[in-house]
A protein has these predicted regions:
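N-terminal Rossmann NAD(P)H-binding glycine-rich loop of SDR-like oxidoreductase domains
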Residues: 9-37
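N-terminal Rossmann-fold cofactor-binding loop
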Residues: 43-48
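NAD(P)H-binding glycine-rich loop region in Rossmannoid oxidoreductase-like domains
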Residues: 63-106, 114, 134
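Conserved Rossmann-fold NAD(P)-dependent oxidoreductase catalytic core, especially the SDR/UDP-sugar
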Residues: 106, 110-155
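Active-site Tyr-X1-5-Lys
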Residues: 152-179
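NAD(P)-dependent short-chain dehydrogenase/reductase
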Residues: 172, 176-228
Length: 355
């Protein structure tokens, strides 16, 4: 991997939405690190993080992008900015798809419109592998694969709609450089509590941590199988910094090797795989969701079963990007941190924080 020159980052003002979350925290670590050439970092969040690294050197602006009142905050947030990285995305409450759509899709539209109105030269939008249509398990897909998503997934539908909103706005403003980032599953140990609460809920998350034997030795995984990749949040942040430095445009897949099937996942975690028919797993998840035992709607399983693995050649070639962390190591470290209840001090990454 070529070293990042950072020549074009010198003196830039960079605005980051969703700056206190999983990816936002990783990006702030880079942009505010000693020796960073970035002149100013602005962060947008619903709640102000504590005044500790990496949040303490950020100029914070507070608003909820799902509310029209945010339209009065965004102009000041984006005034004089050289680039905005839009990371803000709500995963909960999963039982309120209307609320999620307002925050995620309409909020994205608000940010991009405000960026164009403020004359921001570069807009980077964080998307996801979930925008891709179902693909073959035997090959990785490039950025030209159809972006129609997995229809049964609320998350996937909103990601597709958010990308469409970005295209709709920037398509009328060719003077603005637009970048769309489509990573595979993004993990880091510091986000273990955040992700555990999002997908297991506080009750099952706490129970899973107290029952390590049951939690760590048997792993029901679907038949016929899965093909899943993982990438460390720090490696995604590295790619984002390279996009800012080079003002790279267009879509970029981000994934680390290896792509893992069900057996590889079980081996990595030291578990015993229990092959389970996919319809049975989905029915169990649907029942648990209906009974309010978990906050995870069944569409998440559909993404895991159907979303294709990603080819990151474009990022490697145009950005000289290569992840420093192997995907299997990222998964193993994350699950270990999940068992320890590991977190960071931000309002989203801290297990005592609200959603």
């Amino acid at each position: 991997m070529a070293e990042l020159s950072r020549d074009h980052l010198q003196g830039l003002t960079v605005a980051v939405t969703g700056a206190s979350g999983n990816l936002g925290t990783a990006l702030l670590r880079r942009l505010t690190a000693p020796g960073s050439p970035v002149a100013e970092v602005r962060g947008l969040a619903r709640r102000r993080p504590p005044d500790v690294v990496p949040y303490d050197l950020v100029d914070w602006h507070l608003t909820d992008l799902g509310e029209t009142a945010s339209e009065h905050v965004l102009p000041g947030f984006l005034d004089g900015v050289d680039a905005v990285v839009h990371l803000a995305w709500a995963l909960q409450p999963g039982r309120r798809p209307d609320m999620l759509h307002r925050v995620n899709v309409e909020g994205t539209r608000r940010v991009v419109r405000a960026a164009v109105a403020a004359g921001v030269p570069h807009v980077v939008h964080m998307s996801s592998l979930a925008v891709y249509a179902a693909g073959p398990r035997s090959q990785k897909v490039t950025e030209d694969w159809p972006t129609t998503g997995i229809p049964s997934s609320q998350y996937g539908r909103d990601k597709v709609d958010a990308e469409r909103a970005v295209r709709d706005v920037l398509g009328r403003h060719p003077e603005t450089t637009g970048t769309v980032v489509r990573p595979t599953l993004v993990l880091q140990p510091e986000a273990a509590s955040e992700i555990g609460r999002y997908f297991l809920g506080p009750l099952l998350y706490g129970a899973a941590r107290m029952l390590p034997g049951a939690f760590t030795h048997l792993l029901p995984l679907p038949l016929p199988g899965v093909a899943v990749g993982f990438v460390h949040a720090d490696d995604v942040a590295d790619a984002l910094e390279r996009m800012l430095d080079r003002r790279a445009s267009g879509p970029f897949n981000l994934a680390a090797e290896p792509t893992m099937d069900a057996d590889a996942i079980a081996r990595t975690l030291g578990m015993v795989r229990v092959p389970t028919p996919a319809p049975l797993l989905r029915a169990a998840l649907s029942a648990a969701y209906t009974a309010h035992l978990v906050p995870t709607e069944p569409g998440w399983l559909d993404i895991g079963l159907n979303a294709p693995a990603l080819d990151s050649t474009r990022a490697r070639m145009l950005l000289d990007w290569a992840p420093k962390h192997r995907g299997d190591e990222v998964l193993a470290e994350f699950v270990a941190a999940l068992g320890r209840g590991e977190s960071a001090p931000g309002p989203l990454l801290n297990p005592t924080g609200g959603l």
